[in-house]
Amino acid sequence: MEKMHSKSVSPVPFNNSNNTSLGGLRKSSSIPTLAVPECESMGNKHIEEERTNNITTMAMKRRLLDPQNKKKQNRFERYSSSNHAQEQSSEENFCRSKKDSTVLKFGIDSILKNKNAEKVPKGISNAGRIQDERFTEACTNTSSNVNPLSKYFKPSSNDQLGARRTATSFSSSSEASDSKSCCTNNNEEARYKYRVIDKRKSADSDWSEDATGNEADDPDDHINQDNCDLASTLEQSRIVALEILKNKRLRLDSSEALNDLTPYDQLSRTEDQQISRRVEMMNHQAFARENNEWPRSFSSGLQDPFAKNLPNAFLPFYMQPYLRAYYNIQKYIYHKKLLNRNDRFYREANVENDNYKTEESLRSPSETKQYSPDASTFYPIRTEDSNGSRNLKVDVEEGDKEANKLFKDLCVSVGDRLSNALSYGRKDYNGLSTSQTSGNRFLNFSDKGIQAGSYYQTGERNDSLAGPLKNSGMSFDFPPKFGSNNSSTDKPEQEDNNPQTIGSEYQINTQRSMKDNLLTAKLLENEAKLRYGNIVTQYPRPFSWPFAASVRKSYDPALRSYFSRFNNSDAPHYGAAQVNPTAGNNFKSMLPGNFENPYFFNELNTLDTTGFLSRQYGHMSSSQNPHSETQNRSEEVRGTVKKRRKWNRAVFSLMQRRGLEKSFQSQKYVAKPERRKLADALSLTDAQVKIWFQNRRMKWRQEIKMKNRGLVPVHILGQDHEIEKEKTQTPSDEGEVINVD
């Protein structure tokens, strides 16, 4: 065996005074580290450079270590910590390049789990740096939650630099069988080197400074021995991740959702756990960058952030819940893979037999290949068109039963909610179906069979949104072409040729178009309520929602088309379809009578000059002749008919009127908080309740004046007749028209 170089300094392992000679990897005498013998192969040049750096460090300490200036202390500590980390990194790289030793990591949990010093793992030797009794006491003292090794590394009171450092783990290096890689100290053979890991060199450490400049206590200074069982910890983390997904408590808006699945936030970490957590956080940061590309509101265009080859994979807006469920599954699968990778890393690092010396385990953690998400990590989304149906295809790993089951449960739960909305107005609703062949899971959502054709035709694919979209049987394109007028504007020119034929076709197309509009409104209402809660009830019109501005910039043509119909002045701003205004007064009779939330569809019933449905179908009446209707519309388009001024009116159902009347009898004036509660209870807006109470108070004052004069109001004389009439009316046909302007 060769001897150590004669110029090397023999360090004292537990002397923490300021005058301790430097040796091995120690950067400063104040750093409470265990000395490391230097390999002879490092050469004199490496030793001289190390001594020069040590002299510089000592000079900086004497110059900056002023008890009255804590900022300089902190600055020196940061400098020394970073320099110390660089020294360790250069030492490891040098030894690895010379193949003198191999770094094998052993967590402190593998040491402390042994009750006796004789049962120390094979890779750890107690013949070198630590006295036998101290090491035995450290290994046997496992009852306390405080690190039993910390008292041997506690610096003196004069040691300002290392006052808050704690020894958390060791690293051992095995000596190769070749005699050239042998190291000695004090003429004794030493096969392993030890060093204390400085926790603050970690990029993810939680050190901070308070207002006085003192550094806060590190929460990970003490190791909880109850959490050393990594296998059970990983299993618990996996169960928690599943529960988070099943209970739908996983947030999707930012990288904070990933913190809910971080398995080591609540654990006191050993060195191996710190290294793995550092790798894990890097993976989470990379995943968060992908997460930022995911649309966080329904105003965003639906893009697949994982499939790099489909940057513009737009999907119908009513399939967004399925995509959210898919996103949950992707996050679960990603975290599960990350846990499996970390579990494999720990298993390779803690095996106590000779079989663990594989190519993977012989690498240091810094050389271990990091698990980072890329396009191949996640299962891509693909859309397929078959016979007019839009199907969503998702690839799932074959044999991953948990992911498949979770995927199916989430999709079915979302499908149940959507089926209630989409089944309105269509009899042959296909709903949700799943199938799996050769590891591919198909989520089939068919929009074929909607009256007046499919919303999304087979010609509308990922990169063809700007192309012409033709829907047979509809009076206008849905969604419309960008920057083009609606196809329904060409109908008046055709009416002069054959008004009888064109009139009947136009009436059929009009009825279909109205059903399509109502179906669209129903879908958007459910989607908005699902995302924004009761915010829809506070705003009477969709374009007055707070997120309407972002919707106008959306890439989803369906949302653009929908919002353009409620506000014609904004239509040119975001490329919506232009329509010719008309007038009318009998749109209400054409609406179905089974609306669950009439407040939302009041805007469709409104005879407003800016309303799409009232402008195009306002003059239509069920009792009118379609020929005369066509003629009136043609004359109006030519400008021969003067437009009438129409008021924005609201129609209240019988239940709403009774609820308002009951509240008015108990209280004539309603405060704003109570008015909002009443509006929410009756599915009305705050403005509608306010205007109703104003009109009702006006009638109430007139009744009082007439009673004072000895007169009986006219509506009281016919009150019994009106009550009988209300009993025979249906909720969709009755209503009180009130001026809300």
From Swiss-Prot:
Polar residues: bias regions: 79-92, 363-375, 616-629
Feature: DNA-binding region: 645-704
A Pfam family it matches: Homeodomain
Free-text tissue specificity from the UniProt record: Expressed in the tissues of endodermal origin.
Biased composition range(s): Low complexity: 7-19, 169-181
Keyword set, alphabetical order: Developmental protein, DNA-binding, Homeobox, Nucleus
GO molecular function, one term: sequence-specific DNA binding
GO CC terms: nucleus
Region span, Disordered: 1-30, 61-96, 146-183, 203-226, 357-383, 476-501, 616-642, 722-741
Compositionally biased tracts (Basic and acidic residues): 63-78, 630-639
Gene3D superfamilies linked: Homeodomain-like
Compartments in which it is found: Nucleus
Database matches in InterPro entries: H2.0_Homeobox_TF (IPR052497), HD (IPR001356), HD_metazoa (IPR020479), Homeobox_CS (IPR017970), Homeodomain-like_sf (IPR009057)
Family: Belongs to the H2.0 homeobox family.
Protein name as it appears in the record: Homeobox protein AHox1
Lineage start: Eukaryota, Metazoa, Chordata, Tunicata, Ascidiacea
